[in-house]
Structure formats: C-alpha cells, structure tokens
Curated annotation (Swiss-Prot):
It is found in: Cytoplasm. GO terms for biological process: 'de novo' NAD biosynthetic process from L-aspartate. HAMAP family: NadA_type2. This is Quinolinate synthase. The keyword ATP-binding does not apply. It holds the Pfam family NadA.
Length: 322
C-alpha cells in the first residue's frame, strides 16, 4: 500500500470537524488562503477564508499576501488565480472539476468567430479558458457584465460569450445589440417558465429571484435578477421572508447563514431535465481539500505566454469594474 493510499484512507476516516481543524492548521503552516465559490459544499465554505462569486474571488486572488492560494471551485477559477499570481503556488482539490460552459467555447472556433467579425471587440465571461481570455479584449462576470458593456461606445460592435443567456440579459438591460456565442450553463438553462409559474402559485408569499444565466422566459417571471453576490445582498436586505431561488442551490447555505429567519426554496426543475446541481463544484470535497494541502498538489500551472495574454483582458475587467 502506498503512502498516498494510506493518506486517502486516513482522510476518509476523519470526521468533518477533525478535517476542518487539520485544514486550519495547515493553512497557518503554509501561509495559505482558501478561496471558495458559493456553489461549493457547505463544509468547503466553512473551511474557506473567503467565499464569493467569480469577481470577488478574482479580486481576492489579486490582492492576497498569502504564499499559497487553495482554490475550491472549478478549473477556470483556479486558472484565473494563477494568471493573476504567477509567483504563488495555486492548489486545487480536484482539477478535474471543469466547467461545461467554458468547454463549450473551443479556442479555434472562437478565433474563427473573431476573425469573421474583425471590427468587433470581444467581451468574454470569466467562465472561459485562459486561451479564450487571451483571445478576448475584456473579461466580465455576471456581477459587472452590464456595467462593462455600458462603458463601450455605442457604435462599437461587441462579441459576447460564451453564455448566451447572460448575453441576452445584458442586451435587454443595455439596449445593445451584441453577437452572442451560443453556450450556456447546464444548471441554469434547465429552469423553465412553466415550473417558475407553478412555484409562485405554490408559494404565493415567496419572491422569485434568479441568476442571469437563466433563460429569458425564467427571468421575466423573477422580481429580481442578479449575480450570486447580488442575490445574497438582495435577500439579506429585503423585508420579504421567503424566496424561490433560481440558481445553483449551493448558495442557500450562505443565504441561510446571513438571514437565519428567512426561508429559501430551491426553484423547481423540469423532471425531464433535472440537472439542478453543479456536479463539478461538488467535486471539491473536504478530504480532497485537506489532501491537496498536505501534498501541495495538484498545483495549477499556466504557460507564461498564455498567462500574459490572458492577464490583459482580466486586468481590463478589474480596471473597468473598480
């Protein structure tokens, strides 16, 4: 039996509390910071120093003084942290946790799309690979996409990708006509209008709120649309006591933590398309987090020429959303 196998068996036999204690001890020993997305498991969020959306986590990665960044999210997030911090070690509990939305935009196809529209600038959702970021002019998140698009001169043609639903929402909000890449998040795209109407009838006192990665038919049923951080702020400040939440249900942990007296109902899915959970986010388990810190592996690396190209579009986002 190998040492690695022994360590995996040991980690599997530890309680959540014991693993959390070990993770905290390792964090101090390594001078590490743990960043986690709102869609990760509750115990991962408990272990994290900062839990946030893509923009908040990118800013945290840019500003940290830690020597090691441990990123519990999906691959493009850890990759973005490495792009911003080439001199730091960036670890990820499970590099196999990819993002199907990011994967829906292959480098060569996106390059051809750009070449077909040479006068357009490309504003690209952060849910994309480093190669796509290098091919882009400005990166955005769901928190700042509208704000960034509003800063572009009205005569300038815009390519927006890879999420068609977020792009359509930004078009509606800004009145801009953009060329949309036809990607989507499988979790958010699975919501349908008929089930939102049924949920509102079933819970008449609850307010429907939704993430802009949902389809337009769902968004028109919502009384508030926003990024994960915006949804959290809204529910925390709202006088309403119950909410139907149309986004990945991992966010309910933070909502309940911030507003313990309120009720949060996961929006229902079509039984014929019941993909309500981001299984990639859930690949970040507490034992994997512990083991990646013990082993200082898997480590995320980015080729320097790729990193430099991608950094320009990320920096442009951070400047435009400051």
């Amino acid at each position: 039996m190998t040492i690695a196998t022994d360590m995996h068996k040991e980690a599997a036999g530890l309680s959540t509390e014991a693993l959390l204690r070990r993770v905290q001890a390792l964090k101090k020993e390594m001078n590490a910071i743990i960043l986690a997305h709102y869609y990760t498991l509750p115990e991962i969020q408990q272990a994290a120093d900062i839990v946030g959306d893509s923009l908040a986590l990118a800013r945290a990665a840019e500003k940290t003084s830690a020597d090691v960044i441990v990123f519990a999210g999906v691959y493009f997030m850890a990759e973005t942290a490495k792009i911003l911090n080439p001199g730091k070690m960036v670890l990820m509990p499970d590099p196999g946790a990819g993002c199907p939305l990011a994967d829906s935009c292959p480098e060569e196809e996106f390059r051809a799309f750009r070449q077909a529209h040479p006068d357009a600038i490309a504003i690209t959702y952060v849910n994309s690979s480093a190669a796509i970021k290098k091919l882009s002019d400005i990166i955005c998140t769901s928190s700042n996409a509208e704000h960034i698009v509003r800063q572009i001169p009205p005569e300038q043609q815009i390519i927006f990708g890879p999420d068609r639903n977020l792009g359509a929402w930004v078009m509606k909000r800004t009145g801009r006509d953009m060329l949309l890449w036809q990607g989507f998040c499988y979790v958010h795209d699975a919501y349908s209008e008929v089930y939102m109407i049924q949920a509102k009838a079933m819970y008449p006192d609850a307010e429907l709120i939704a993430h802009p990665e949902c389809r337009e038919e769902v968004l028109r049923q919502a009384s508030f649309v926003g990024s994960t951080s915006a949804l959290l702020d809204y529910t925390e400040k709202s006088p309403r006591k119950s909410f139907i939440v149309a986004t990945e249900p991992g966010i309910l942990y933070e909502m309940e933590k911030r507003s313990p007296g309120k009720v949060f109902i996961p929006a229902p899915k079509d039984p014929a398309n019941p993909r309500s959970v981001c299984k990639q986010m859930k690949q970040n388990t507490l034992d994997k987090l512990y083991l990646c810190m013990v082993n200082r592996s898997p480590e995320i690396t980015v080729d320097e020429s790729l990193r430099e190209g991608a950094l320009k579009s990320i920096k442009r986002m951070l400047e435009m959303s400051a």
